[in-house]
Amino acid sequence: MQKTVQFKDVSLYTESFGDSNNPALLLIMGAASSLIWWDEGFCNKLVDKGYFVIRYDNRDTGMSTSYPVGKPGYTFEEMSDDAIKILDAYQIEKATIMGMSMGGMLAQMIAIRHPERVKSLVLLASMYFAEGAEDLPVFSPEVQKFFDDYGDYRPIGYRAQVDYAFKQWQATHHSERKYDLDEIYKMIELDVNRAIDYNSKLNHSFALVTGDELTRIKEIGCPTLIVHGTVDNVIPLIHGEMLSKTIPNASLLTLVGAGHELHPEDNDCIVEAILELNK
């Protein structure tokens, strides 16, 4: 089911799966990535286990509000509050919040800003920002080179946008999992085709964090599951380990051989871990 959530000058495109009377699970995707990267197979596995699942396009992705490149009209705090607007629109009092990468950063902020709305937290391939974060490694040399080479690049035209996105996918998906690259290319074509302004996704690198929530994760009181791949070349495993050590009541699910990804091969074990989290 599709629903557009509107408030002020913001429009957020959402999709839901399953029975709205079931426990809710809200999915927040990472930087520059639309909702399609939450695989429908993963969503349906959660539905089969009794969840009502919502995924949505963050601002500047997919069919949600876009802003001129370099001029995002929002902060990350406002992006995190978007999730609450969506819960309100679906009349959901409390949900499991699952975020990947930047979505995990937003999920951490939500758990601090709106603890009464968060039943539990799932952080997939997410970054640690609290005490000692400045000493942790981030991008691998290969990923850093890609962003150094293409950091200011704004592809013009459909084919250039698809080719650029495919190069980015290749640079950031160091993994022992197998992929059908033709299917990935088709996914990227869909991503570009459905976007209001595909280049506006670059705004996630311009948006600012203005509060201190990310340094206060010791205050998170809900059950938390950290999921991280051992060969993640965008946000190394140490970030997941630090999150699990710092957040009270957190557990760590390590995906051996997985990178910065949600791979179908891992769907079952992640879903089972979420079920265990919410027992």
Predicted regions and their residues:
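Acidic catalytic loop of the alpha/beta-hydrolase fold
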Residues: 231-235
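Catalytic active-site module of serine/aspartate enzymes centered on a nucleophile-bearing elbow/loop
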Residues: 250-279
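Conserved HGGG/HGGXW glycine-rich cap/lid loop of the alpha/beta-hydrolase fold
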Residues: 10-66
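Flexible "cap/lid" loop of the alpha/beta hydrolase fold
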Residues: 121-155
